[in-house]
Structures are given as structure tokens and as C-alpha cells.
């Protein structure tokens, strides 16, 4: 039999669902870290100081120009070649340095921060110059303009793109399975090797990721609607009157 639904439901899905917390932890922790790293990178990429600006842009180009898998392998397999072996074995950080989960977190965070910074940089550039000039005209400092005008407007502009990046980040966590992290994809690969069945583990993993993406998209859409709620205004009363007069029923003879 090529595909067995009972095997999928009884054997595969319970193990895949048990690995969902690991996938969510990879996504949430690296997503939060990428935002914390991306904000200063975006500000530095648009700074007036030329060395700071070009060094930030060069870093963004380097991270965006290299595959995530290469970055992950450099961290996981190359970090141990740099630091002394005694330090990795005897230091307080040795439990973390031996856990592939944290290497995946660092690689995902650094990689995603470059894309977050690029999105935020474009959103900051999209803030109308008139609003910034108005803030300065009211006597605001550069920090106040950034905090009260540029920041809120840029986040509103960047929210749809950041939602898309969050979905891509969730799907990028499958690469953590290549360094022995047992997330959903790592568990699916283990089941494939142990049972010699291909379709059930992969189909089950696909179903889990589709559900996770849906659970991520729905609250993101509600958040975007909530943030932009003030942009939805009721039609002007005069426009409603014109529409009513232009309708065919308005010219019909009374009974």
C-alpha cells in the first residue's frame, strides 16, 4: 500500500504534534530576536553618518546574499573550530553550545533580521516628508519625531510585509532539522528513516505547517485591520445623498 490513512492518523500525527512546540519556539524566539536586531540595523542603514550607513548596508547585503543553510552550517559546524575546546566543555555556556537548537535560533535570527531591517528601512522612507517637517515645526526633537511620527507610521506600513516574513520564517525552521533539531520536519524525517514510509510523514508535516500558517495569518490580519481602523471612514453624507438621487428608484413616480 502506497498511502495508509490509519498509519498517518495513529502513528505519524501524534509524533508530529508533539514536535509542534519546538517549531513554535524556533519561530517565536527567532522572530522576536530578529525584530530587536532589525530595528537598529534599519536606523543605521539610513543614518547620516556615512561609515555607519555603509557598514550596515554591507552587512545587510552579506546576510541577504548568502543562503540560510550556509549560515546555519557555519555556526553549527564552524563555531567549535574557533573557540577553545576546553571553553566549550567547561564554561557555563557549554549546555547551550552543545544544543543545536540555539545554533538554529542564532542563524534564523541573524538571517531574518536582515530582511526585517530592509522592510523597516523601506517603511521609514515611505513616511511622508510633510509629516516629519510638521513635527519639527511643532518643536519636536529628532527623537520625538522618530518616536511619535516616524515609528508608528512605519510600523503600520511595514505590517503586511512583516506578516509575510513571519510566514517565511516559520517555513524556514525546517532547515533546523539538518542540524539534528527535532522539530516537525526533523520528526518527519526520523519517521521516514525508521518506517521506510515516505508519504505519510511528509503529508502529515505539510498539514501541520498549513495549519500553523493559518493560525499565524488570521491574528495578523486582525491586527492589521485594528491598526488601520482609523483609515476606514463612513462615506460623507453629501456623497450618500448624491448616490440616492442618482439611483433609478429616486426618479420613479409615486404610487
Residue ranges and their predicted role:
Residues 1-255:
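Transmembrane alpha-helices and adjacent helix-loop boundaries
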Amino acid at each position: 500500500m502506497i498511502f495508509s490513512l490509519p498509519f498517518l492518523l495513529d502513528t505519524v500525527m501524534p509524533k508530529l504534534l508533539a514536535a509542534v512546540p519546538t517549531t513554535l519556539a524556533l519561530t517565536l524566539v527567532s522572530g522576536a530576536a530578529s525584530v530587536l536586531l532589525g530595528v537598529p540595523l534599519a536606523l543605521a542603514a539610513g543614518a547620516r553618518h556615512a561609515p555607519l550607513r555603509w557598514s550596515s548596508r554591507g552587512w545587510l547585503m552579506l546576510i541577504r546574499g548568502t543562503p540560510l543553510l550556509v549560515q546555519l552550517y557555519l555556526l553549527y559546524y564552524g563555531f567549535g573550530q574557533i573557540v577553545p575546546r576546553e571553553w566549550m566543555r567547561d564554561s557555563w555556556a557549554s549546555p547551550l553550545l552543545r544544543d543545536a537548537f540555539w545554533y538554529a535560533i542564532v542563524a534564523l535570527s541573524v538571517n531574518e533580521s536582515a530582511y526585517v531591517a530592509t522592510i523597516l528601512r523601506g517603511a521609514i522612507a515611505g513616511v511622508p516628508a510633510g509629516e516629519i517637517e510638521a513635527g519639527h515645526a511643532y518643536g519636536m526633537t529628532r527623537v520625538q519625531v522618530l518616536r511619535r511620527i516616524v515609528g508608528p507610521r512605519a510600523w503600520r506600513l511595514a505590517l503586511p510585509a512583516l506578516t509575510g516574513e513571519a510566514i517565511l520564517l516559520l517555513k524556514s525552521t525546517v532547515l533546523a532539522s539538518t542540524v539534528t533539531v527535532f522539530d516537525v520536519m526533523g520528526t518527519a524525517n526520523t519517521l521516514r528513516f525508521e518506517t521506510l514510509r515516505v508519504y505519510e510523514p511528509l503529508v502529515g508535516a505539510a498539514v501541520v505547517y498549513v495549519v500553523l500558517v493559518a493560525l499565524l495569518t488570521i491574528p495578523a490580519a486582525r491586527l492589521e485591520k485594528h491598526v488601520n481602523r482609523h483609515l476606514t471612514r463612513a462615506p460623507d453624507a453629501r456623497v450618500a445623498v448624491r448616490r440616492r438621487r442618482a439611483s433609478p428608484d429616486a426618479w420613479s413616480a409615486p404610487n
